[in-house]
Regions:
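Pore-lining transmembrane helices
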Residues: 1-51, 58-266
Length: 268
């Protein structure tokens, strides 16, 4: 669902092109919002115009004036600001020590499990994909991918290791959670988190944070913003591939054991 529908296409496309000149992913994201909401603003400003101008509104007023608004803001404000931010972020990443990278990786990995597809999850993902697209650094992309894969894998492992603590209906989702986890689809754990939020989220955040931190400790880099285990063949080195899997396995096992232990036996 778009913000402004068809009239927002041209200013949105221009915002994306201008962002590619240095403002990067986040600059393009903000430019898209500016394009969409500028059309909405123009619609409100012209709503009292005579109906005979309706054709001109959609053909001339909305696309041209929204393009002017978006272009001016992108050229004079968004572009320069986010170009500078991208330079700062690139320098910061290049000078970041291992300890700081591990800490940030753990935070990002943990955030992926806090709300499993919600705004906190999306904030961590947006930061990492922004760094990935603007600096070609896939380190934090590996952290969020590992962290996001842990919850469904942990649930599936808990059902495997603690069979007496899950009823038959819950056990039916074991295979699907394995598949979703390996595919980096965190939302597979949501039904369990909805039933027992503190136990599920608490246990998953621990393992996801550990997985995210370990990817940074071992210098893992992801070659794509999504894909789970399917990105492994494209990883830059065998080292990254091996320790990406090891990081996820450690995090999932820790979370799965914690959840299985604290859940207790199911009620009959």
């Amino acid at each position: 669902m778009s913000i402004a529908d068809k009239p927002g296409f041209m200013p949105g496309a221009v915002a994306g092109y201008m962002a590619s000149q240095g403002a990067g992913f986040l600059g393009g994201l903000i430019g898209g919002f500016i394009a969409g909401y500028s059309v909405i603003f123009l619609k409100k400003m012209t709503k009292n115009m005579s109906k005979q101008f309706d054709g001109m509104k959609s053909m001339v007023i909305y696309p041209i004036f929204s393009l002017l608004i978006t272009g001016v803001l992108m050229y004079f404000i968004i572009g320069p600001v986010f170009t500078k931010i991208n330079v700062i972020v690139a320098n910061w990443l290049n000078n970041m020590g291992t300890a700081n990278a591990v800490l940030l990786g753990a935070v990002l990995g943990g955030m992926m499990s806090v709300d499993m597809g919600g705004p906190i999850n999306k904030a961590a993902y947006a930061f990492s994909i922004g760094v990935f697209t603007d600096t070609n650094n896939g380190a934090f992309m590996a952290a969020v991918m590992a962290g996001g894969m842990v919850p469904p894998l942990a649930i599936a492992l808990a059902m495997t290791l603690f069979k007496d603590r899950f009823d038959e209906k819950e056990q039916q989702s074991k295979i699907s959670n394995f598949i979703l986890g390996l595919s980096f689809i965190t939302e597979g754990a949501i039904p369990f988190a909805a039933k027992e939020p503190l136990k599920v989220i608490g246990s998953c955040v621990v393992g996801a944070a550990i997985a995210g931190g370990l990817t940074q400790f071992w210098g893992v880099s992801a070659p794509a913003p999504h894909g789970g285990i399917f990105v492994i063949p494209a990883m830059p080195s065998v080292h990254s591939a091996i320790f990406f899997v090891v990081s996820i396995a450690i995090g999932a096992i820790i979370s799965g054991v914690i959840f299985g232990v604290i859940r207790g036996k199911k009620n009959n």
